[in-house]
Amino acid sequence: MTILKWALIFLLVSIVAGVLGFTGISAASADIARFLFYVFVVIFLVLLILGLTIFRA
């Protein structure tokens, strides 16, 4: 859950920085948030597949 929380924090930083006109910080924060979100999705899918196959017994 921590990775998803950090992704949301960086997303909020990106939005606030974009509204205030700091486009460099906004773009960097958006990239970090996107990366962390995809890492979270991959971990979720791996654990879901493992839960449905190996750890079922």
Swiss-Prot record:
Chain segments annotated as coiled-coil in the UniProt record: none
- Give the record's keywords alphabetically: Cell membrane, Membrane, Transmembrane, Transmembrane helix
This protein's source sits in the domain of life called: Bacteria
Q: Pfam families, alphabetically? A: DUF1328
Q: Which InterPro entries match?
A: DUF1328
Q: Which residues cross the membrane?
A: 6-26, 35-55
Which residues are connected by disulfide bridges in this protein?
Answer: none
Location(s), subcellular: Cell membrane
Would I find Transmembrane among this entry's keywords? yes
In terms of one coarse class, where is the protein primarily found?
membrane
Tell me how this protein sits in the membrane.
Answer: Multi-pass membrane protein
Q: Would you name any one GO CC term?
A: plasma membrane
Q: What family does the entry list? A: Belongs to the UPF0391 family.
**Protein name as annotated:** UPF0391 membrane protein bsl5717
Q: Which organism is it from?
A: Bradyrhizobium diazoefficiens (strain JCM 10833 / BCRC 13528 / IAM 13628 / NBRC 14792 / USDA 110)
